[in-house]
Amino acid sequence: MDIYEKMKELGVELPAAPAKWGLYSSCKKFGGNLFYVSGCGPVIDGPVMGRLGKEVTVEQGQVYARACMLNVLAALEKAVGDLRRVKSAVKITTFVQSADDFHEQPAVANGGTQLLLELWGEEAGLPSRSAIGVNALPGNIPVETEALFEVDTVSP
């Protein structure tokens, strides 16, 4: 099924590509057909803030990780022009702003990974992944995700 038809079927809408918070490329092509998307935070009707295991629950964190992935996909679409060109989600790294005694970073990261699975299925949508607990993230956001995608060099 066409990725845009799949998104419509699932009720998934991409936001506008996120604004950058510094001097960097939002999405960088390298190695011929690989695109690295810089870290994206969640925006759900405005900014969200807090630390997992303190102000933010695992379930909220999963929603935020999904929102991060929507922003990643919006940045990727802006760079490549069409998500039908995506061949594979290769690798994602999810950073989770965590309280000292919080150890459920992988469960939080599942929110973003689940979206990729829903859109592209297991073979193309299940990436390798790291879920990393950190002390602080920019703007006090609870979750940030960066990703690497393999993209077809020919437009659909």
Regions found by a protein language model. Give the residues of each.
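Short, polar/acidic, helix-capping and beta-turn segments at strand->helix junctions
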Residues: 1-156
